[in-house]
């Protein structure tokens, strides 16, 4: 499987490790607007994001991963690219624990040590970061991010774009509203409205 990585910063380093840990998987391009021109370095394309069309014309069988940690930027890039869904798939670490009854949508990345338990549902282009826990019956909206060691106990709902900070915990049955943020180390004991 060939991959194009959108974003060439810190998050892309972990994505690179996930991809290259699998036999037969390889990265053919890193696209980031910090680059002005499309070039190749050791047979890997390096260039601006708009170069994606040229690469897809030459390699129509690739998968695209948005390696951007910031939720709003990740959503903006997905909307700007406007690619058909078949170019995206979940990228799941072999060192994650995933319940067979969990549902994980396209473009979502599950990092090493993450645990996704029974009947959890995870939307599009979500990051479940290193060692995060998404327990039974949780629902995570598109473009959310559960940071390293974040913990969603049972039946928690995250709406679109929510950020759960490093080591934060949300107790059972709560809802975190659209584009809200939970700070690192927090324990959430009541639901949070949108845009907080």
State each model region's role.
Residues 90-196:
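Structural signal for interior beta-strand "rungs" in well-ordered beta-sheet cores
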Residues 36-97:
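Phosphate-bearing ligand-interacting subdomains
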Residues 10, 72-73, 187:
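Short alpha-helical
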Residues 2, 26-28, 63, 87:
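Residues at the starts of beta-strands that form the adenosine-phosphate
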Residues 16-18, 76-80, 122, 193-194:
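Short amphipathic alpha-helical segments
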Residues 22-40:
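NAD(P)-binding Rossmann-fold cofactor-contacting core
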Residues 2-17:
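Glycine-rich adenosine-cofactor-binding loop
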């Amino acid at each position: 499987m060939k991959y194009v990585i959108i974003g060439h910063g810190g998050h892309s380093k972990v994505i690179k490790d996930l991809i290259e840990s699998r036999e037969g998987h390889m990265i053919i391009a890193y696209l980031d607007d910090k680059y002005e021109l499309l070039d190749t370095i050791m047979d890997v394309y390096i260039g601006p994001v708009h170069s994606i069309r040229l690469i897809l014309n030459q390699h129509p069988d690739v998968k695209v991963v948005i390696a951007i940690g910031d939720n709003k930027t990740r959503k903006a890039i997905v909307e700007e690219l406007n690619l058909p869904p078949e170019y995206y798939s979940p990228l799941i670490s072999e060192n994650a624990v995933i319940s067979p009854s969990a549902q994980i949508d396209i473009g979502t990345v599950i990092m090493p040590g993450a645990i996704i338990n029974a009947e959890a549902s995870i939307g599009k282009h979500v990051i479940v970061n290193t060692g995060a826990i998404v327990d039974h019956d949780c629902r995570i909206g598109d473009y959310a991010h559960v940071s390293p060691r974040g913990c969603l106990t049972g039946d928690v709902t995250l709406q679109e774009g929510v950020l759960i900070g490093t080591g934060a915990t949300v107790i059972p049955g709560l809802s975190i509203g659209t584009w809200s943020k939970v700070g690192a180390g927090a324990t959430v004991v009541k639901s949070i409205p949108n845009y907080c």
